[in-house]
Amino acid sequence: MKHVEIFTDGACKGNPGKGGWGALLRMGEHEKEMAGSEKETTNNRMELMAAIRALEALKQPCRVTLHTDSKYVLDGITKWIFGWQKKGWKTADNKPVKNEDLWRALVDAVRPHKVEWVWVKGHDGHPENERVDKLASDAALAA
């Protein structure tokens, strides 16, 4: 199984407002940058979109190390999701899960792969995180 490193970030100009996401996929020497935007969105939705689109870009099942600076994405997919699914997409206090559509899409995007989730501190000089932050910010400005 091939190993792919993925770095993701989301950005929003206003929250809600114009938003963008960026992703960097790296397999050995090969790299691919991706970005996208929405006119009316939130930062959390863009963080989720970055991970979803990056995973969907993989053409075969892979071992993935996915780096994100979003505790929302990291905690959501590694901790909270199991309870949400058990409770019919309700939170611990029985409210509907925000961004359920994207959480469901992320679950589907993860399914074929073996994903290790890694948190990286944002805006701390991490080169790949800085790259995807710029991709996301540029995409948000262009939305």
Curated annotation (Swiss-Prot):
It catalyses: Endonucleolytic cleavage to 5'-phosphomonoester. Residues 1-141 form the RNase H type-1 domain. Mg(2+) 1 binds at D9, E47, D69. Gene3D superfamilies: Ribonuclease H-like superfamily/Ribonuclease H. Keywords: Cytoplasm, Endonuclease, Hydrolase, Magnesium, Metal-binding, Nuclease. Its EC number is 3.1.26.4. Binds 1 Mg(2+) ion per subunit. May bind a second metal ion at a regulatory site, or after substrate binding. Mg(2+) 2 binds at D9, D133. Its main location: cytoplasm. Monomer. This is Ribonuclease H. It comes from Novosphingobium aromaticivorans (strain ATCC 700278 / DSM 12444 / CCUG 56034 / CIP 105152 / NBRC 16084 / F199). The gene is rnhA.
